[in-house]
Amino acid sequence: MNTQDFCFILKQNSHLLREGCFGLEKENVRVNQDGTLALTPHPAVFGDKGKHPYITTDFSESQVEMITPPLPSVGEALGFMETLHDVVTENIGDELLWPQSLPPVLKENQEIPIAHYSGEFKDKEYYRQKLAGTYGKERQLISGIHFNFSFSEKLMDVLLKSGVCGSSMEEVRETVYFRVVRNFLKYRWLFIWLYGESPLAEETLNVISLKTGEKQPMKCGVSLSLRTSPLGYRNREEFFIDYSSLEAYNMSIDKLIRENRIDGPHELYLPVRIKFLEKDNGSPSYIEVRIVDLDPFTKSGVCASAIYFSHLLLVYSLLKEENGSLTEEELQRATRNQDMASCYGRDEKKELKCCSTTVQQKATSILEDMERILSEYGVLDDEIYRQEMQHNLYLVQNPEKRIGMVLYENINRVGFVPFHLENERQYSET
C-alpha cells in the first residue's frame, strides 16, 4: 500500500473519520444487599437468555450481560446502555448490580453457579464448565465492558474506489482493520493508565495462578487495573498472533487450535479482537476493545470519557504511520507495557519497556502526537472530541486526577465493599 496516497485519501474525506457504528457490551454481577453474590436464577422476565438480543448472562447465572445494537454515535450507544441498565435494575427486586469489575464478597467455598442453558444452547454451558476448570470460577466473575467499533461504510467505499488498499472490499477491510489493531496493541497501555478502574480487590479474593495453578491473593504492585493485569482475565499462555495479514492471522490461530491450546478464536482473551461477520465474506467487520473496566462513579457503569478516548485512539491508530507488521518481540513488549500500566499504574515515574522514559513522559508524547494528527485530519473539529482530548492532556499532567486514582483513594477511605454498595444503592434509587 502507498502510505502517502492512503493518507491523502483519508485527509480528503476527513469528515468520515469520526463516523461509524458503535456498540457496547457490559457485564455486572448481581449481589445481595450485603454485597454477597446473589444465587437466584437469571430473572425470568427477560425470557430465554440464549435468544434475548440485549440482556443475557455471561459466565455465571449471577452475571448479567447487557448488549447494545450497533448505533451511529458514541452518545447513542451510551444512552442505550443506560436504558438497558435501568431495565435490569428495575427487574431484579432487592438485588443490586455490583458496580466494580472485580468480584464482590465471595465466602469460603462459595457456590458460583455457572450460567444454565438448555436445548440448542446447551453447548454454552459445557463451554463454561471447561473454563471453570481451566481458569477458576472466581476469575470468570471478573466483569467489564467491550467497546465495538466499525468505520463508516462510506469511508470503506471511498478507499475501495481510490484503489489504495486493493481492488476488493475484502482487501480494504483487511488493510484498515489490521493496521488499526497493530497500532492499538502498541498503545493500549496508555488507555489502561488513563482509565483503569480496578485498583484493589476485596481482601479475601483469591484466584488460580495461571502459572502454578494454586490459589493466590489478587494483588500486584501499585495496581490500577487488576482486571487487565496478569492476575486478571488472561489466557493461561501468552500466544503470538500474526497480525501482518488476514492469511497470517488465520494461520496462527489455526495452529493454536491444531495444537489443542485453544478451542477456537472465541477462547482468545486478547485486549482487542478483530471480529468477522458472514455478510462481509470472511473479511474483518469491526474491532472489539476489551480493556475497559466498569466505572463505579457512573450509574450505567460506563465512563463516557473512556469510550470517547477509545474511539480517538482507534482513529489515531488508523492514521499513525506503521510498518505493516508486529514481531513477536514487539507484541511481548506491548504486553509488558500493559502489565506495567495495570500493576504499577499508580506510579507515574515507572519506566516503559520500550525506552528509558517514564510513563508520564511517554503518555504526554503520545497524547501530543494524537492531538496534532487528529487536528490535522479534522477529527477534533467536533466540540465533544476536542474537549475529550483536552481532558486527557489534563490527566497526564495531573495523574492524581485519573479516575482510577480517585477510586483508589475512596476504597482506602471507605472500604472496598461499603464504597461500592453505597454507590450502587444511590444509583438504584434514581
Language model: regions and residue ranges:
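Terminal catalytic/cofactor-binding subdomain
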Residues: M1-A132, R139-S143, F309-L312
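Short, flexible loop/turn elements at secondary-structure junctions
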Residues: R30-N32, T68-P70, S101-P103, F149-L155, ...
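Short conserved micro-motifs at the rims of enzyme active sites and ligand-binding pockets
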Residues: L39-H42, L78, E111, L159-L160, ...
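Long, well-ordered mid-to-C-terminal structural blocks that present hydrophobic/aromatic surfaces
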Residues: D254-C354
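Long, well-ordered alpha-helical scaffolding segments within enzyme catalytic domains
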Residues: G79-I92, L160-G196, G301-L326
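Histidine-centered divalent-metal-coordination microenvironment in nucleic-acid enzymes
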Residues: E27, R139-S152, Y286-D293
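Cationic, histidine-enriched alpha-helical/coil surfaces that engage anionic ligands
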Residues: N323-E328, A334-T430
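Loop-rich catalytic cores of soluble enzymes, especially ATP-dependent carboxylate-amine ligases
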Residues: L106, Y117-K137, L141, S150-P284, ...
